[in-house]
Amino acid sequence: IVVDNLEDDITLSAALYSANVNPKAHLLAYFKDEALSQLLNQHCPNAECIPAVGAEMLAKAAVDPGSSALHQELLASTRGMTQYSTTYPESASATDVQSIFVYIKRAYQATLIAIDTGKGIELNPDLEKVILPGTKLFYIADERIERIDWSKI
């Protein structure tokens, strides 16, 4: 369920209603006001709130020229390299970041950029970090990898 309205209060109301009707749905809500994102997360911890990032992107581009083009490239879903996610299978054995990083780079020309073990996203994790089954993996690739052969790690 995607909720995006010009008025944040309407977005909040629609998101709360949607979560009440279908609590297991993947709920995305776009807010200009980060305080309302936090309020929705208090009532709906599974909601994914997308903040407005225009000011942050301007500041980043001022300090690191070209950053805005990089961010646009990563967000574009119709061209070039884009960010995707997958879950390390429950049936797989524990491994480490280095093994997954090297494997998906060689086999799929993808780059592992972050993991989420359930405690929040960790960007650029240490190569020695243990990856347990169920860990969410974030990567950059030209297209989504539909079937990763985890047995070849």
Regions found by a protein language model. Give the residues of each.
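Cytosolic regulatory regions of ion transport systems
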Residues: 1-153
